[in-house]
């Protein structure tokens, strides 16, 4: 089996790691960074940019620069969280034909898994460049509180990126895996507080170690899949917009370019205030009116930032209490607190966590890398490279069906260890009912309408009988990825209907397959684009160098040779303008051949210059300068 890489597909940043011997190694990307911004941009010339290159051009291309797509993945357009984002995102969030939240960019409708696949492709390429081999399998992490639709959409993204997703693993569980593998002995209960760019999770995990065997058992999990650093940034941006409006009377929300500049500046200010008490947001020429350009200069203190976001930090405490209650533990039972996600670097977050648990969180876990490291370890477990590790994760929300009166009847309660399988027998609600509809739900509300609808299907061909007589066995089967498979069976006729729950909408297999093929086609297009750029760059360099050499050659080059070379230069310039790779390469070779005379002239001039500069007694002088010396060969073991 080939290598299974671990990918932390984050809202703000992503990270990739691989098992290197017994240790997981975080891999640096092409830009030399250990994390990659989860930003995708579509440039005017058709190039798809991912990561830092996409981030750099965001200000000038706000409509086609997509970020925080994880907040949309597996979500319906009508979801209140999506509606909230529509007002603050500079790009267009639209309603897809199936009711999902999609994005409009480069005059195309794009599904969130399709966009996230671009980030996963970058992670895949980063790993391949490091390993020197093709990578086809991965463990991808998701927030523990992701529902079934969001998990399925993440798997779809992996498939579109050309990866076989061997396992979907919860982010806090992955972080605990990274932390716990270094523990040599003893048992402990850890709380993983994961506040990332777009999501918040808390997981209570028991780590048992005995005779070298590690068991990681998730006791309870809770969270909010729409609370994270992006929301903190938005609070800062709103404050800056309002302050500028007070001073100038102008609303920057109507200017996408200005808002993109504000987003970058707001995020930077927030990060700076984790170590400084005050910073200044300075954006010259932020906008203009009839009187001329306007500049934004606003001082922001840590105290002000904390007042803007304190409500959101406090909002993370309720899930902490609920998770402890679900695990039947008290604060005193927690041995260690692990902080995960970049937003946990904020002093206010650390203060609240410390006060809640009555002890300092650990400082030896990298909040940006722990999740990817844990995913890589899980990859090692699945490939057989890591032995003696057992991971027992849970389903974050209850799963059930709608029964008579619009009630949700749970078959699998929240925090049940997965994989798991549960069956329950139901019956008909009316006399002579020939079919039943199985409506699958996820959530904690007793009222069916208050829960997330995961899908529905019909079981037909039930024999006519009085209500309550037929025996319909409904089975829920959750796999290790936390994805649900449902079946309904008529015990009388043995007729059965099965489905894998995708979402009430989601991408069909055909749509995913089409996106996989599009990605493959784009892979070839990207390769051709890269080759074209290389050919153009080589041609430009040759044109510049040749003209410079012709000038330096002067009269040593005949007019006839000069004319021949200039004609070849012009032909190459025309080929570059036309943009045909084969023509550029052909004309490049013709110019190299035409410039052969130039090389002869240059060599002759060098030889002449060398002869003039050599003194008559040079050889004697060289002999006089020779010094006999002992030497020792030094071998460099590092090479």
From Swiss-Prot:
Question: What keywords tag this UniProt record?
Answer: ATP-binding, Chaperone, Nucleotide-binding, Phosphoprotein, Stress response
InterPro entries found in the cross-reference section = ATPase_NBD, Chaperone_DnaK, Heat_shock_70_CS, HSP70_C_sf, HSP70_peptide-bd_sf, Hsp_70_fam
Q: Which residues carry this modification: Phosphothreonine?
A: 199
The UniProt record lists the keyword Ribosomal protein = no
Q: What induces it?
A: By stress conditions e.g. heat shock.
Region called Disordered, residue ranges? 602-639
Q: Does the keyword Nucleotide-binding apply?
A: yes
Q: Which domain of life is it from?
A: Bacteria
Residue ranges annotated as compositionally biased, kind Low complexity, are 602-613
Molecular-function GO terms, alphabetical: ATP binding; ATP-dependent protein folding chaperone; unfolded protein binding
Kindly list any coiled-coil regions of this protein.
none
* Start-end of Acidic residues biased regions: 625-639
This molecule's function is given as:
Acts as a chaperone.
Protein family (similarity comment): Belongs to the heat shock protein 70 family.
Recorded protein name is Chaperone protein DnaK
Species whose genome carries this gene: Pseudoalteromonas atlantica (strain T6c / ATCC BAA-1087)
